[in-house]
Design a protein with these regions (language model features):
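Short, conserved "active-site rim" segments that organize catalytic pockets and cofactor/ligand binding
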Residues: 2-82
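Short, glycine/charged-enriched secondary-structure capping and boundary segments
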Residues: 65-69, 89-91, 117
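Acidic, glycine-rich active-site loops and adjacent beta-strand->loop/helix elements
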Residues: 79-82, 108-112
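Thiamine diphosphate
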Residues: 83-98
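Short acidic/polar active-site loop segments enriched in Thr and Asp
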Residues: 101
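Conserved functional hotspot residues or short segments at active or partner-binding sites
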Residues: 105
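Conserved small/polar residues in nucleotide/adenosyl-binding loops
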Residues: 114-121
């Protein structure tokens, strides 16, 4: 059975903000990504303290932006941050089964997907 992290949404958000401040200052993620940590998460399960919904853009890396290690974030990537029942199922799984107490929708600019969709809509008018 997976042990849930006992934290509050406020504490999880505080931890994300602190990690982001370290990222802005250092831009190097020194969190544990060792083989031992990977093995531990395989044996004992993942225990994320936050669910991050973010764009599919390969340049947006939540684990680095928030300076986290393996198993700390449950990241869901979707173009334009538009969720449907599949992403909602992942959110429910992370919150209900894994015990992640915080959901963050992380956007960025410019968003190519949104720009593309807007121009496709204009062309259809």
């Amino acid at each position: 059975m997976i042990k849930h992290i006992t934290t509050t949404p406020a504490k999880a958000l505080e931890k994300l903000k602190a990690g982001n401040a370290r990222y802005i200052d250092a831009k190097v993620n020194s969190e544990d990504i060792s083989q031992a940590k990977r093995t531990d998460t395989l044996v004992n399960g993942q225990k994320p303290y936050a669910i991050i919904i973010t764009c599919s853009d390969s340049r947006v890396i939540p684990e680095n932006i928030f300076m986290t290690g393996i198993g700390e974030l449950f990241v869901i990537r979707i173009a334009g941050n538009v969720i449907d029942e599949h992403q909602l199922g992942s959110i429910e799984y992370a919150a209900s089964h894994l015990g992640a107490p915080l959901i963050v929708v992380m956007g960025h600019t410019p968003v190519s997907y949104t720009h593309l969709r807007a121009h496709e809509t204009e062309a259809d008018l």
